[in-house]
Amino acid sequence: MMPEIGNGLLCLALGIALLLSVYPLWGVARGDARMMASSRLFAWLLFMSVAGAFLVLVNAFVVNDFTVTYVASNSNTQLPVWYRVAATWGAHEGSLLLWVLLMSGWTFAVAIFSQRIPLDIVARVLAIMGMVSVGFLLFILFTSNPFSRTLPNFPIEGRDLNPLLQDPGLIFHPPLLYMGYVGFSVAFAFAIASLLSGRLDSTYARFTRPWTLAAWIFLTLGIVLGSAWAYYELGWGGWWFWDPVENASFMPWLVGTALMHSLAVTEQRASFKAWTLLLAISAFSLCLLGTFLVRSGVLVSVHAFASDPARGMFILAFMVLVIGGSLLLFAARGHKVRSRVNNALWSRESLLLANNVLLVAAMLVVLLGTLLPLVHKQLGLGSISIGEPFFNTMFTWLMVPFALLLGVGPLVRWGRDRPRKIRNLLIIAFISTLVLSLLLPWLFESKIVAMTVLGLAMACWIAVLAIAEAALRISRGTKTTFSYWGMVAAHLGLAVTIVGIAFSQNYSVERDVRMKSGDSVDIHEYRFTFRDVKEVTGPNWRGGVATIGVTRDGKPETVLYAEKRYYNTAGSMMTEAAIDGGITRDLYAALGEELENGAWAVRLYYKPFVRWIWAGGLMMALGGLLCLFDPRYRKRVNPQKTALEAA
């Protein structure tokens, strides 16, 4: 009975989403305030109905209702209860329901926190978000219903959740990533509303920027957590593999970063209007593209879900409709919001525009590297592979000018400035950068690698100028805002991430060895000694745990416990890496296959500064959070001066 209630709630949600898509827009056309205000009620009803359906599915997992096909395929009675809850979004149907839940949640949030925004804007934005919900609800109900039954011949035991997903990462990574994906729908809806009305000014940016910041924060956290999860779970010792689905999350992050900076220019200088709208459309369009890549089954990825052609065609059609319609609208009405401001070459606006172009170029590189093998194969031209060397080389060339401009940008004034005003500061920063980028590799690794020096030069340039500019502001008693300190934190976070990448990419040591009890291997300054392997049993798995002692200069450093697990129901073997993490290095061991004479295949790593990559990501997210506290976003705006008046 409960699954039928869940299905009924989804049908109800579809009806409400249709009303939300049409009725408020009718009110805008008629100038009827009550009809426009109904958008908030519909948003609340939509969220409640989808949340109800989602809770029904969670309950089905918790009580092991194997009459539901989705539950029977992704859970069993031996699975710990917290993984049963997380299994709700662990596969195709449930993850789509999570998407719709978060979509309705963002819609409801806009309805709640838009009391200071003119009613006609709210009606347009919520209606557009309702249209997106309609598309996904139709997709769920007709191709991916999570409440489909196994009746009358239901199994007494489920197949189990994919062992790769039986990790705390599943609890947090998909919701955070989807919060970012779906959050960009708010900026998208504001952009479409602006194009429909044909007017845009700095008020638009004030409305849109906090929502874009929130989405960007969630997406940043999702990417950081996903990278850390891959690092410790897959046993490869890597933090980024340029996997197509990793790229699918990275592309909207790049464009979203450009969008945040472009919104700052639109808010401060009423410039870059059409460019800002195009970025808002592109960010959400790339989120839809990522969904298509994961759900359609057109690519090979450790993240991709097996899917039938009907699902892929539905998503493709929906994606073409949304993206194509949005771009056509932009082509037809973009000229109505075009800026008439001429920016000086040496101004903050121009430097931000240059960095925006570099971010978009980086996105296009990732897009090309992701889709070209797919297109090449579909055209019958054979299989090609675009791997890490291509991406790393292209990003290096793009990031050097990006870092250069990023360091200088905050020092330059809006409108027009003179380079000579900051000449002395730039000279000091250049000398400091040169010294640090040569000294740090020698201090920590006793050798200098050219690519490490280049990476550290970018990081030090950004960090030195950010700290110097902040110190100057404090010494002069200049007023600072939350947005300013958020910018400083985010830029320093990027510098920290670059340091982590530079060291881990160029100084990591990897050894694949054959070890038995008593064998030792030296890596860097550490000696790894294989002690023994003992049997161990978990709630739904059994396996062995290897004990590996680590010493440094003859003194005990740590003990690593690397596991090999066999999951009973799934019938699959998994590696659980052992990691001893530190501020400046990680020691990493992964247990491979058992060999003859009591020996085991073991993979050992020395990873310097790898945790700085994720620490920098967290600092960037913190910077975004500080920007959200800026009081400008809580001021009421005069409806007569809004950027989005009724057409």
For the regions a language model picked out, list residue spans one by one.
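Membrane-interface helix-boundary motifs at transmembrane edges
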Residues: R30-S39, F113-V125, S197-T208, E267-A274, ...
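Membrane-interface interhelical loops and short amphipathic "cap" helices
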Residues: M1-L9, D32-M36, N59-E93, N145-P174, ...
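Soluble non-transmembrane domains of integral membrane proteins
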Residues: R511-R603
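Transmembrane-helix bundle segments that line or gate the permeation/cavity pathway
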Residues: V50-S73, T77-L79, A86-A111, F139-R149, ...
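A generic, lipid-embedded transmembrane alpha helix
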Residues: L45-V62, G135, F218-L225, L286, ...
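Contiguous transmembrane helix-bundle modules in multi-pass membrane proteins
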Residues: M1-R34, L45-G52, F66, P244-P252, ...
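Extended, hydrophobic alpha-helical segments in both membrane/secreted and soluble proteins
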Residues: P175, V182-I192, Y204-S262, W275, ...
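A conserved hydrophobic secondary-structure block that centers on an alpha-helix together
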Residues: C11-V22, V28, S95-S227, G235
